[in-house]
């Protein structure tokens, strides 16, 4: 008799995706982040659902409703801090996942890669709108500054900003619609994840060597299920430690001050995971130019497969490209640091140099070095 998991209409889909899926035998821990992102999304949707039961999206009561969640709701503080720090974990895993894709040449699966970029934008939009909901000082001013950037779009900019605000400033209408979209977007993200996996399973996984692994495949279960569970335990332990010992470590103290349109905070800055893009935005002294650079800092990932000039897929055996990759990582850390600093000397010039380097490495240096490596290997 055939096993039910192979015949049942629903179970056979799960079986072919998580049980009998042929996977390369050489996948390292860098391949764990996809499943970790799935866990992050599940944690965010669950905690978010329970938070939404107690939150009110009205400018008069939003801040107090968050205080009420933390003080009066059973384990409300746990839910709130799991949700806030869960977002940080989400982005740590996201950036490591994208970094893995860049290093090992996974971007040559262009459909999977492009859906991934779409997912990155969707998660960033969700996180931005979520940050506005507690209606603290940084929520209000962050929303004002970032939405105001759209006014740089020629001709329609001002109308577009007022349309998004639902008035002439960030107010009640803005908060209500941001809450609606913040609730909706994670489900769109979940749907996109399904498409992401669908395209991935069309081609099969890449592996650290970048060499086709068809002759050497192993079943996903039990090998990678156990490996993924270990990853879950490590990540959830780290998240729990963050939530229970220093829940406000990654937040901004200004957000514990209720939103006040008449009082601007000394340094308006987004959450840490947007600082690199914020630094790139600030490094260009022109509004439209800055907005374009901000969008391109993420959209540049779509160009990476086109600029792949190496005869090898992975960077595993390409030391010169490896050097550039780690230089890129250092540049991103530098940009993250600069994004949190005031706009003054020497931070401005460091940010500008780092921004130029960021685009130069991805657009010029990596393709050139790849060609050079081909020549060195007489290919």
UniProtKB/Swiss-Prot annotation:
Q: Which InterPro entries match?
A: Cyt_b/b6_C, Cyt_b/b6_C_sf, Cyt_b/b6_N, Cytb/b6-like_sf, Cytochrome_b, Cytochrome_b_C_euk/bac, Cytochrome_b_N_euk/bac, Di-haem_cyt_TM
Q: Where are the transmembrane segments?
A: 33-53, 77-98, 113-133, 178-198, 226-246, 288-308, 320-340, 347-367
Output a single Gene Ontology CC term carried by this record. respiratory chain complex III
Q: Which residues are involved in binding heme b b566?
A: 97, 196
Is Calcium found in the keyword set?
Answer: no
Q: Which UniProt keywords apply?
A: Electron transport, Heme, Iron, Membrane, Metal-binding, Mitochondrion, Mitochondrion inner membrane, Respiratory chain, Transmembrane, Transmembrane helix, Transport, Ubiquinone
Q: Which cofactor does it need?
A: heme b
Per UniProt, what is the membrane topology?
Answer: Multi-pass membrane protein
Question: Which is one Pfam family of this protein?
Answer: Cytochrome_B
Q: Where does heme b b562 bind?
A: 83, 182
- UniProt subcellular location: Mitochondrion inner membrane
Q: What is its main location?
A: mitochondrion
Q: Which CDD domains match?
A: cytochrome_b_C, Cytochrome_b_N
GO-annotated molecular function: metal ion binding; ubiquinol-cytochrome-c reductase activity
Q: How is the cofactor bound?
A: Binds 2 heme b groups non-covalently.
Give a short account of what the protein does.
Component of the ubiquinol-cytochrome c reductase complex (complex III or cytochrome b-c1 complex) that is part of the mitochondrial respiratory chain. The b-c1 complex mediates electron transfer from ubiquinol to cytochrome c. Contributes to the generation of a proton gradient across the mitochondrial membrane that is then used for ATP synthesis.
Query: Extra info from the record?
Result: Heme 1 (or BL or b562) is low-potential and absorbs at about 562 nm, and heme 2 (or BH or b566) is high-potential and absorbs at about 566 nm.
Record family assignment: Belongs to the cytochrome b family.
User: Subunit structure of this entry?
Assistant: The cytochrome bc1 complex contains 11 subunits: 3 respiratory subunits (MT-CYB, CYC1 and UQCRFS1), 2 core proteins (UQCRC1 and UQCRC2) and 6 low-molecular weight proteins (UQCRH/QCR6, UQCRB/QCR7, UQCRQ/QCR8, UQCR10/QCR9, UQCR11/QCR10 and a cleavage product of UQCRFS1). This cytochrome bc1 complex then forms a dimer.
What this protein is called in its record is: Cytochrome b
Q: Which organism is it from?
A: Monophyllus plethodon
């Amino acid at each position: 008799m055939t096993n039910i998991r192979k015949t049942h209409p629903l179970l056979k889909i799960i079986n072919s995706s998580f049980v009998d899926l042929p996977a390369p035998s050489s996948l390292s821990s860098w391949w764990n982040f996809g499943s970790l992102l799935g866990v992050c999304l599940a944690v965010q949707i669950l905690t978010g659902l329970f938070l939404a039961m107690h939150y009110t999206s009205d400018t008069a009561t939003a801040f107090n409703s968050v205080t009420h969640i933390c003080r009066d709701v059973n384990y409300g503080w746990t839910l709130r801090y799991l949700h806030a720090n869960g977002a940080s974990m989400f982005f740590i895993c996201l950036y490591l996942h994208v970094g893995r894709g860049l290093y090992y040449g996974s971007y040559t699966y262009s459909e999977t890669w492009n859906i991934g970029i779409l997912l990155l934008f969707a998660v960033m939009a969700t996180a931005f709108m979520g940050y506005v909901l507690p209606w603290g000082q940084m929520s209000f001013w962050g929303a004002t500054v970032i939405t105001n950037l759209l006014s740089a779009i020629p001709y329609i900019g001002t109308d577009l900003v007022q349309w998004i605000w639902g008035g002439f400033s960030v107010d009640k209408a803005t908060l209500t619609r941001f809450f609606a979209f913040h609730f909706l977007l994670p489900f769109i993200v979940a749907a996109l994840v399904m498409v992401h996996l669908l395209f991935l399973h069309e081609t099969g996984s890449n592996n650290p060597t970048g060499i086709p692994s068809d002759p050497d495949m192993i079943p996903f279960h039990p090998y990678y299920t156990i490996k993924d569970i270990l990853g879950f335990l490590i990540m959830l332990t780290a998240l729990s430690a963050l939530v229970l010992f220093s829940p406000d470590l990654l937040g901004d103290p200004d957000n514990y001050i209720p939103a006040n349109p008449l009082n601007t905070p000394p340094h308006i800055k987004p959450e840490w995971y947007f600082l690199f893009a914020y630094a790139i935005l600030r490094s260009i002294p022109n509004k439209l130019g800055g907005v374009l650079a901000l969008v391109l800092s993420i959209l540049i990932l779509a160009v990476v497969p086109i600029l792949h000039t190496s005869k090898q897929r992975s960077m595993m055996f390409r030391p010169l490209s490896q050097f550039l990759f780690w230089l890129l990582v250092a540049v991103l850390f530098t940009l993250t640091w600069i994004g949190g600093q005031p706009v003054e000397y020497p931070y401005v010039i460091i940010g500008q140099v780092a921004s130029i380097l960021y685009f130069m490495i991805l657009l010029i240096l990596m393709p050139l070095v790849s060609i050079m490596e081909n020549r060195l290997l007489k290919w």
